Every structure is written in structure tokens, then in C-alpha cells.
């Protein structure tokens, strides 16, 4: 809503991955329920690569660890996800929870204030 670039990362359970889970698995739709787990190094890598790669911009992703080879092409990893819709509060595949007009005044004020920064 602010118009600033961002990458929102929602991790699975820290360090609950299996020994064969070497691949980063990005999903969307607010799917974090406790399982599957995620290697904390995968969380750090997704945070870093989301900031460095253009395809990571305006993304809300859940990150998990899965069986398979480690990711080497982070641009492609993020490109396989969908960008969030401009001006929408929720992630692209999230359930639309609360319309902005129904958010508390302090939340609406913060969003308006942060949207003015840098403009």
C-alpha cells in the first residue's frame, strides 16, 4: 500500500526440516500452519535474495525447506511466484481479511504516513 519495494517472508517452523530438505520451497496463500519446517539458512537466503533480485519485489511468500537439490537461480525462484496486487493489503493469494476502511484509524494513519515517505 505504501508504494515502496518490499519482500514479505513468512517462514515455516524454524529448524524442523529433515536432513534431505536442501531445496528452498516458496509458496503463496498464507499456508504457514506449523509444517513443513524450514532451515534458518533458507530463511536468511530468501530475505537476502528477495532484496537483491528484481523478481523478488512486491512478493509475499511462505518459505519452507524441501527434498531436492539446493536452489542456484533465485531470480527464477521468485519469478515463479506472483507479485502482490498494487494497493491491496493482503498477499496475492491470501484470504482477503479486513478491508482498509475497516482497519483501526491508527493503522490507516500509519499506512498513509508511510506511503508519503520518499515521494
Report the location of each language-model feature.
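Oxidoreductase cofactor-interface core, primarily capturing Rossmann-like NAD(P)-dependent enzymes
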Residues: 1-91
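Amphipathic terminal alpha-helices
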Residues: 88-119
Amino acid at each position: 500500500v505504501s508504494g515502496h519495494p518490499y519482500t514479505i517472508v513468512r517462514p515455516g517452523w524454524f529448524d524442523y526440516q529433515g536432513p534431505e530438505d536442501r531445496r528452498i520451497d516458496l509458496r503463496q496463500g498464507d499456508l504457514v500452519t506449523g509444517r513443513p519446517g524450514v532451515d534458518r539458512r533458507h530463511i536468511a537466503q530468501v530475505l537476502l535474495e528477495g532484496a537483491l533480485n528484481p523478481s523478488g519485489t512486491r512478493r509475499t511468500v511462505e518459505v519452507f525447506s524441501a527434498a531436492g537439490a539446493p536452489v542456484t537461480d533465485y531470480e527464477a525462484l521468485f519469478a515463479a511466484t506472483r507479485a502482490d496486487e498494487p494497493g491491496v493489503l493482503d498477499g496475492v493469494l491470501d484470504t482477503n481479511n479486513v478491508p482498509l476502511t475497516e482497519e483501526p484509524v491508527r493503522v490507516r494513519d500509519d499506512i498513509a504516513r508511510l506511503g508519503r515517505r520518499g515521494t
